[in-house]
Amino acid sequence: HNPSGGGQDSSDHDGPKFDVGGGETGGPIYEPCEGDPKREGGARGELALSYIWIANTSQGTISKINTQTMVEEGRYIAKPLGGDPSRTSVNLHGDVAVANRNGGIAKFWANPEDCQESNGIPGIQTSSGTADILPWGEDECLAWYTELTCGSNRPAAWTRGDYSEATCGYSGAQLWTACDTDVLLLNGETGAIEQTIPGIGSFFYGGAADGEGNFWGLDTGGVGQLLRVDIDDFGVQTWPLGPIGGYGITVGPQGRPWTCGGGGVSRFNLDTETWDSVGAGGIGGCMTDGESVIWHSDGAGLLLGYDIETLQVVSQVQLPEYVHGVSVDFDGYVWGVGFTTTNAYRADPITGDVQTFDQLVGAYTYSDMTGFALNSAGSAPPPEG
């Protein structure tokens, strides 16, 4: 890890390092497999987990950017016609699901070896980068597409699936989403809708899964509410939002859901079913570092790192502009994605060094763009209320 770029090793600065999950936080513990070395930071050493997936909303595409080299390795159309991609979610194989706000979810493989012949042309045809966008139906790294008839299809949140020591990996991951007032659970391999929980929300703006796969949804319609759907019995619980509301949502290493926006963050305490908040409300997303800090941007592009227990700002990095989405990658960098701009920024939270990727088109994503939130999300007993 080298904060000055290029993914080269550095002898004088080791950069941020995470012991991802484990212990009492409930995160997964990855044991290194033979021929599959454990990555620095506690995550498996699969290259597929080194990507950030950002929606180019106005172009109708999503970008696959290597977080270590900052090189875009693929750009994909998100919907057959008139795509409106926004939230992306990355599973623990590195594959992405992208929700189109006007209805429809697509899954793309991260590893080209997983891409399947489907277009009748010999070999695998897939995008190689920024300017290489294949027409819909020709890119064979599209795993599936599920059309949804929605006025609003915003949340997208993978579950981890089931861990197998035999394969040293996860299988059976499912995908949560919301279609207008319904919450849906999709089969991760086929995209088929396996469960519909109807009419439980008003306007779902985001969602995240905890370590056990339960869905935490942010409903900004009406009075606004936090919502939990149980992965086993699909029971629903709801609570009013905290005093500063919410826009982005994530689940931290203790299994507690957080909402954020405008530079302020709110933590929902599962044991007391109460909120602790700091700052003002507004827009934007957030993510924890898997340990003790949650990152969010204020309206002027100042990345704020809040201690997840004291809610005090313990770290900050100034970016060149407001960033709507905030994500953490597996090497500990904090990413910020501009608000309908061309830019994404990679910040070193230790040195404050910032690097820029500037080839996006109307960027708009503020969900778990790397899979790190899913990897580090904890779980806790559900509130009794």
Go through the PLM ranges and name each one.
Residues T57, N100-N102, A110, A178-T181, ...:
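Short loop/turn segments immediately following the C-termini of beta-strands
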Residues G27-G74, Y170-W176:
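An edge-strand/N-cap motif at the start of beta-rich repeat modules
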Residues T67-M70, A110-E113, N187-G191, V229-F234, ...:
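Short loop/turn segments that connect beta-strands within beta-propeller blades
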Residues V71-A78, L142-T146, A192-P198, F234-L241, ...:
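A short beta-strand motif characteristic of beta-propeller blades
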Residues H1-R44, P383-G385:
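Ser/Thr-rich, Pro/Gly/Ala-heavy low-complexity intrinsically disordered linkers and tails
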Residues E31-A43, G82-V90, T126-C168, G201-G211, ...:
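Repeated scaffold domains used in trafficking and secretory/extracellular systems
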Residues Y51-A55, D95-A99, G172-A178, L184, ...:
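Conserved beta-propeller blade signature
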Residues V337-G385:
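Blade-level signature of beta-propeller repeat domains, shared across WD40, Kelch, NHL, RCC1
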